[in-house]
């Protein structure tokens, strides 16, 4: 198979690197320790670097074209058992191919940018489509032409280029300089995906999606707000809106049915199950300031979560069902024990208050809370 033939194959295939531990050096093409692919010291494409040997990493066609463009046209390509073997002189590359339906993806893009949506700022489109654009499900779009042309993957960070919003900017008359590339970290992508999963019952509704200078903002039914900028993501949980979700009136609340409350908290718990499964609590400590957790994660490092603040590197805070249940078991002796809510305080935080102020479950809505 020649280069010209390969170009006919790749656009209809989703290509993935089969192993994450790519440490070998093949001729002039180097797969480095951090999974950065270079050719003649020029960085061509970056892949996520995981410890799981069986992890498959997605690569888009634009990146492949850059790599293949450096190879001789007489390079040989062989496909055996879904593995793509490339040889060019002393260079050898082995990849695994996965098929996907290109036409269905094009149809989705057409539906997103259909004139019937009447693009405006903010504008609406289907929630599922929105999450496809902003989560890891975006991978196949990398094989398409404009406006979804190229993406840079580095470790757990997904860099989405401005060209992704070309159609939006054109209709909104936004200059390229006004919007910088967005960074959606693994945590933020998880928050988006888990939010969608938690609210799956409402998937027929649309969400508000707004480009505000350097920020990409999502509004989930005026209950949960997710803002992703070029530096960090913030998730806001307005207590008053959550109370509406709980069908609660007033700030002093009595939950006659604790099981029902746990069910609601579990629905809006955004931490992935993998996080809970790999986190082993060493011990718990209760004091006048509230509940303090000391946890040990799978890597052996100790992680302190004080007063139930869920601190994540990119600034996202979330409910966690397991912690919430511990509070209920510790402080609620019966189903009629009151739970107070404190709306946005001077720091912009909101909280559930248990046991006459003995414990606070804090939900942060400000960047300052991270410092």
List each language-model region with its residue ranges.
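Structural preference for solvent-exposed beta-strand-turn elements
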Residues: 1-371
């Amino acid at each position: 198979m020649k280069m010209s033939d390969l170009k006919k194959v790749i656009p209809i295939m989703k290509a993935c690197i089969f192993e994450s531990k790519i440490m070998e050096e093949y001729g002039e093409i180097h797969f480095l320790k951090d999974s950065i692919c270079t050719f003649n010291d020029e960085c061509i494409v970056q892949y996520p670097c995981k410890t799981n040997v069986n992890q498959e990493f997605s690569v888009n066609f634009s990146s492949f074209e850059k790599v293949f463009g450096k190879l001789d046209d007489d390079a040989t390509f062989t496909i055996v058992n879904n593995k793509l073997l490339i040889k060019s002189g002393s260079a050898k590359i082995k990849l695994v191919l996965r098929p996907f339906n290109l036409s269905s993806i094009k149809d989705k893009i057409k539906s997103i940018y259909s004139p019937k949506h009447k693009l405006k700022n903010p504008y609406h489109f289907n929630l599922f489509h929105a999450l496809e654009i902003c989560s890891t499900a975006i991978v196949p779009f990398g094989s398409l032409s404009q406006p979804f042309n190229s993406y840079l993957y580095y470790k757990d960070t997904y860099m989405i280029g401005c060209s992704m919003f070309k159609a939006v900017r054109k209709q909104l008359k936004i200059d390229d300089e006004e919007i910088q590339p967005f960074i959606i970290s693994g945590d933020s992508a998880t928050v988006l995906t888990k939010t969608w999963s938690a609210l799956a019952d409402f998937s027929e509704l649309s969400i508000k999606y707004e480009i505000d200078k350097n920020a990409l903002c999502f509004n989930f039914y005026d209950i949960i707000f997710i803002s992703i900028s070029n530096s960090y993501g913030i998730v806001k949980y307005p207590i008053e809106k959550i109370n509406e979700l709980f069908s609660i009136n007033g700030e002093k609340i009595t939950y006659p049915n604790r099981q029902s409350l746990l069910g609601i908290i579990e629905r809006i718990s955004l931490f992935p199950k993998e996080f809970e499964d790999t986190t082993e609590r060493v011990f718990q400590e209760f004091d006048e300031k509230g509940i303090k957790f000391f946890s040990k994660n799978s890597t052996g490092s100790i992680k302190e979560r004080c007063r139930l603040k869920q601190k994540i590197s990119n600034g996202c805070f979330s409910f966690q069902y397991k912690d919430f249940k511990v509070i209920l078991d510790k402080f609620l002796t019966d189903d009629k024990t009151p739970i107070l809510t404190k709306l946005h305080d001077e720091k912009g935080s909101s909280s559930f208050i248990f046991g006459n102020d003995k414990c606070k479950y804090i939900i942060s809505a400000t960047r300052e809370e991270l410092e």
